[in-house]
Amino acid sequence: RINGAEWDGYRYGMNYDSWVRMVDFASEQGFAYLVLDANWYGPEFEKNSDPVTGEKAKDVQRIIKYGKEKGVGIWLYLNDVAGTNYPIEETLKQYEEWGAAGVKYGFMNGNSQQKNEKTRQITELCAKHHLLINFHDYPVHPYGQERTWPNAVTREYCKAQLDGHQTFEPKTFVTSVFVNMIAGPIDMNNGF
């Protein structure tokens, strides 16, 4: 998340010009993807934040097109509030039509059984609509899902320490990652 960050005399925001700078940087560095994180479609935990027609939907479509021209795929953040309050399949179909590369799905609610079922459903729908998927913020544990669904590239199973403002000690951090990766790929970031 770079919203509000300053670098090289430029203050980044949740806007098209900042996204262009990020795509240009990603392209120059050979990065395949860039994620438009939380709040691009409105305040992420408000039920009326529409993940298809939200605040910056037109700019998102423009940056996806620009990213393709630069060889950078754009992933779109989508959380469980929007995924539950708006038709998930229609949303993912729209992202496919826009040309998005993938979805970072966050803050899934429910008990373990509900989360497992929702993980399977969303992964299958993303595959149907040619989208990669990364489950973020307390998803179900890795279980080899990517064997059936190769579009399920990772999940943040080891807690978003950056968001939680917590840290693991180095030994615990490394051990946790490698033990959990036995079952499948994960992403993890240490906090502060």
Where would I find each of the regions flagged by the language model?
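An acidic-aromatic substrate-binding cleft motif
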Residues: R1-V20, D24, Q29
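Short loop/turn motifs at secondary-structure junctions
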Residues: Q29-F31, G99
